[in-house]
């Protein structure tokens, strides 16, 4: 197992494609990966909070949300999907969010996060089609881990939102990943392996 991030060697910064390419080259030197998990995301921080209304939209916040939640993962797919072996089972899984479901949006708000995760879901679906042509047994999926006890969810947990321990969420996602097959590629699934509407 190898974990990569901004503070690792090599560093991997979603906002810098050169670092993504360098990280992929490092991984390629270790052999073809059978499992790649992208566990990144941005909801709030640096003075930005989730929007409750159109009045709250901020171009810089939206651009950053799309950069981290959609463009960065797309660049990870660009550089890491080609590393998956052409034969045999392999998985690229990225963490999405149920709030990125257009069909399941009943509450509104959280414009930048919702839209950027919906964009991620489309990118996963599209990349899965291309991946299948090269590696028919490989799977590319978007996974919703549930609301997990992290810095991302901390402000909302204090407000009474039920959160799950990170270890529990990770174990659930690994069970879902272990059960994936080629027919699941391009799917958007929750932590129980159930499909989420697009």
Provide a role label for each language-model segment.
Residues 26-40, 45:
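A glycine-rich helix->loop->beta "capping" turn
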Residues 6, 40-41, 97, 145, ...:
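Active-site loop/turn elements of alpha/beta-hydrolase fold enzymes
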Residues 42-46, 50-66, 71, 86-134:
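Catalytic loop of short-chain dehydrogenase/reductase
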Residues 138, 142, 150, 155-198:
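C-terminal helical subdomain
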């Amino acid at each position: 197992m190898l974990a990569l991030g901004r503070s690792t060697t090599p560093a991997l910064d979603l906002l810098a494609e050169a670092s993504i390419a360098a990280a992929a080259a490092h991984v390629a030197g270790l052999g073809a990966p059978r499992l790649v998990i992208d566990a990144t995301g941005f909801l709030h921080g640096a003075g930005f909070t989730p929007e409750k209304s159109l009045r709250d939209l901020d171009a810089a916040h939206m651009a950053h949300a799309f950069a981290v939640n959609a463009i960065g993962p797309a660049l990870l797919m660009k550089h890491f999907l080609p590393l998956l072996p052409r034969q045999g089972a392999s998985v690229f899984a990225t963490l999405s969010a149920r709030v990125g479901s257009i069909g399941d949006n009943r509450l509104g708000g959280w414009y930048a996060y919702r839209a950027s995760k919906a964009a991620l879901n489309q990118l996963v679906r599209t990349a899965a089609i291309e991946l299948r042509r090269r590696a028919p047994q490989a799977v590319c999926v978007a996974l919703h881990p549930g609301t997990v006890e992290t810095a991302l969810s901390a402000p909302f947990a204090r407000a009474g939102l039920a959160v799950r321990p990170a270890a529990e969420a990770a174990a659930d996602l690994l069970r879902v990943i272990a059960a994936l097959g080629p027919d699941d590629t391009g799917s958007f699934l929750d932590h129980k392996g159930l499909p989420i509407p697009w």
